[in-house]
């Protein structure tokens, strides 16, 4: 598989993309980032009536299940990844994580919520910011 920067450069110009397509690209890049850290993705886009979890991964080094919120931006007009994680968002993620865990038999030593910000701009390489353990 080509590097992330080569892969992104081979895509159509960003001006023709929908918000959903940009979000999906951000999630794909976040998953590649998690893979590079040795994490194993358990599920993507898990939904229930209360909302959606973008990525659920396992961190074998920490024996933890990690719920990852992915925020993709093409500009800085709406703030960075830190501004995107409001107390309400954290409460929602905790609730959704609890619901996902309730439906599983497997147990982990730790549960963590991470946020990955993906900034896709004119640069050849997307900027990835990974905030670990926000809740």
UniProtKB/Swiss-Prot annotation:
Looking up Pfam families in the UniProt record yields:
UPF0102
* CDD domains named in the record: PoNe_Nuclease
Gene3D superfamilies assigned to the protein according to its UniProt record, in alphabetical order: 3.40.1350.10
Q: Which GO terms describe its molecular function?
A: nucleic acid binding
Q: Please give the InterPro entries that the UniProt record associates with this protein.
A: Restrct_endonuc-II-like (IPR011335), tRNA_endonuc-like_dom_sf (IPR011856), UPF0102_YraN-like (IPR003509)
Would you identify the family this protein belongs to, as annotated? Belongs to the UPF0102 family.
Q: What protein is this chain from? A: UPF0102 protein Mjls_1965
The protein's organism comes out as: Mycobacterium sp. (strain JLS)
């Amino acid at each position: 598989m080509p590097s992330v920067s080569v892969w992104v450069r081979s895509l159509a110009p960003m001006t023709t993309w929908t918000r959903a397509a940009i979000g999906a690209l951000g999630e794909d890049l976040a998953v590649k980032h998690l893979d590079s850290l040795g994490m194993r993705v358990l599920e993507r886009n898990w939904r229930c009536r209360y909302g959606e979890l973008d990525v659920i991964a396992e961190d074998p080094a920490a024996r933890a299940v990690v719920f990852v919120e992915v925020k993709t931006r093409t500009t800085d007009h709406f703030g960075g990844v830190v501004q995107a994680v409001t107390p309400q968002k954290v409460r929602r993620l905790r609730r959704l994580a609890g619901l996902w865990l309730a439906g599983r038999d497997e147990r982990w030593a730790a549960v963590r919520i991470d946020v990955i910000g993906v900034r896709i701009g004119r640069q050849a390489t997307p900027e990835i910011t990974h905030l670990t353990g926000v809740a």
